[in-house]
Every structure is written in C-alpha cells, then in structure tokens.
C-alpha cells in the first residue's frame, strides 16, 4: 500500500484505497489527482514526492467524497499547493458536512460524522480549463457524484475516478453508490467508447481496455433496478424496499450503510419512476412505490 507505480513517462499513481494520481508537469513540478482518504494518505503521498525530488503545485479533486479529498488540508498546509474541484464538488470540499447531510437527508447524527464520510475542509478553487497544466483536460463523468470528472493527460493516460468499480467490489458489496442513475449509465456508455494508452480507475486495476469492465458495471446497474422492480410488485414503502435489498444481497444494516445505500436506492426509485417502470402514490400518509 502507498507504493508509487509508474504508468507512463509523465504519469504515476500511488496505490492506496483510492488511487492518487501523480502527473509530472514542468521540471520537478507535479500535480496530484485526488489526495487519498485521510491526512495520513496525504503525509505518505508527500513523502513519496519528496523522495523523488518533486514539488507539489496543485491537487485536482475528481469529486468531493472523503476518500478522495481526505489529504487535501494536510497537503495544502505543508506545501501551499492550490486545490481545485469541479462544480458543486467544490462546495462539498469546502464544506464537508454537506456530504453526510446530503446522504442522510437532514442533520447527520454522530454516527455519520467521521473521516470516511466527512473529510477536513480545505480552501478549494473552482476547476476551470485555465487551471489545468498544458495538455491536461478534465472529462465530465457525472453519476457517481454530481459533477465528478476524470482527467486525460498529454500522454493519453485517463484517470477515471469512481465512474466504475472492480468486478470484485461489485460482487461483494452489490450496490455501488451513485447519485444519478441516468447520468451514471450515460457516463459508462461514453467510457466504453474512450481510447487511452492506459485507464486508471480509482477502485479497479489499470488497463488498456476498459470496455468489459464498463459493461459489467452497466449490467449491475440494470440488475439492481430489476431487483427493485421485483420488490415493488405490490405497493411498498422505501424502508421495506431497502430492507428487501439488504436481505437479498446479504448485507448488514448500520447507519453508514443506511445512508449510502439508502441514498442510492432513492436515486434508483427516481430513475425508475421517470422511466415509467414505477409509479409513486400516497396512501394513508405514506409514500408507496409500485411496479407499473
């Protein structure tokens, strides 16, 4: 863990729970793509940079989830680097309490106010094309998070952030977090058509051919949707839908899973309703969902 792995002449990644991209820009200057899941990750990343004689100029966050921005504040305090994040991800990075608040749908209890869901805040700037090094471009990858992006470097390495997960992760945890099912599927379809020398997903192995994994992720989204429709053959409320999925997949409920999977299931319900697969109605002061 926290091994520096070279991908191309200019690009590396630090193997960690969420890969940290390292891109050489000019001379001994480098930028990072994400900063890891905690200040410890930031410390280890900085140590690797210093061992190679590199100077950190900026961190480009793909999105605002805590496992990608956890090292921001440490790196900023110890190097003075600038930090950038796209769209609404910047607001969540500046104000991390928004993350558990969004997931829970209200003021989050103490069980959701921890480093895995709520990183330390950092002074974060809007990600614009002018902020990127020459030859580096941001690629919109919404779905997993609101305004998530990936990055393509000048030597055609594509960092894919969290737009897809490994087969092992999908098979083990079943429900992969997302905020927008439609956007997620559209992103995966675009990824299927991408070319790169190497793709670097944050939570899967690097590869020169991403198509099979992207298709596997697409299939899993539709599988979950089908399971939700099956649960909704009779009118049923959200809590029962969530319980039914946990029972079917052999998952164990706790506050964190309730928030993460619950938020994701609500996104599926919205998508299925808009697609015409579910109808929603109120009965006896309860919101019920039923397969059409």
Where are these regions (language model features)?
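Divalent metal-coordination and catalytic microenvironments
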Residues: 10, 23, 34, 49, ...
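C-terminal regulatory/interaction regions
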Residues: 230-292
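Metallo-beta-lactamase
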Residues: 37-39, 137-225
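A short catalytic or substrate-binding loop motif that flags glycine-/basic-rich loops and adjacent residues
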Residues: 14-16, 132, 141-145
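Hydrophobic/aromatic beta-strand patches that form the interior of the parallel beta-sheet core
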Residues: 12, 60, 84, 125-127, ...
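Active-site HxH/HxHxD metal-binding segment of metal-dependent hydrolases
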Residues: 40-132
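A structural signal for the main folded, soluble domain(s) of proteins
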Residues: 29, 43, 50, 70, ...
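Conserved beta-strand hairpin/beta-sheet module of binuclear metal-dependent hydrolase folds
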Residues: 1-52, 150-162
């Amino acid at each position: 863990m926290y091994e520096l792995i070279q991908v191309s002449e200019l690009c590396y990644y630090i193997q960690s729970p969420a890969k940290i991209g390292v891109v050489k820009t000019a001379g001994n200057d480098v930028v990072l793509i994400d900063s890891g899941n905690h200040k410890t990750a930031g410390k280890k990343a900085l140590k690797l940079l210093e061992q190679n004689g590199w100077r950190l100029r900026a961190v480009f966050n793909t999105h605002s989830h805590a496992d990608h921005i956890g090292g921001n504040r440490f790196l900023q305090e110890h190097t003075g680097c600038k930090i950038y994040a796209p769209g609404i991800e910047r607001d969540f990075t500046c104000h991390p309490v928004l993350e558990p608040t969004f997931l829970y749908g209200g003021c989050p209890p103490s069980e959701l106010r921890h480093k895995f869901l709520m990183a330390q805040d950092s002074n974060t700037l809007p990600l614009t094309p002018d902020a990127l090094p020459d030859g580096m471009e941001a690629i919109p990858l919404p779905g997993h998070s609101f305004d998530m992006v990936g990055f393509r470097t000048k030597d055609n390495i594509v960092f894919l952030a969290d737009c897809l997960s490994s087969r092992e992760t999908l098979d083990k945890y079943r429900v992969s977090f997302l905020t927008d099912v439609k956007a997620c599927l559209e992103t995966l379809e675009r990824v299927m058509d991408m070319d790169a020398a190497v793709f670097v997903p944050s939570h899967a192995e690097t590869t020169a051919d991403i198509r099979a994994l992207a298709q596997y992720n697409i299939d899993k989204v539709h599988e979950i949707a089908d399971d939700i429709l099956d649960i909704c053959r009779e009118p049923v409320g959200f809590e029962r839908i969530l319980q039914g999925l946990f029972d079917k997949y052999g998952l164990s409920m706790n506050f964190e899973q309730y928030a993460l999977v619950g938020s994701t299931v609500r996104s599926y319900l919205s998508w299925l309703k808009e697609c015409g697969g579910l109808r929603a109605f109120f009965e006896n002061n309860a919101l019920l969902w039923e397969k059409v």
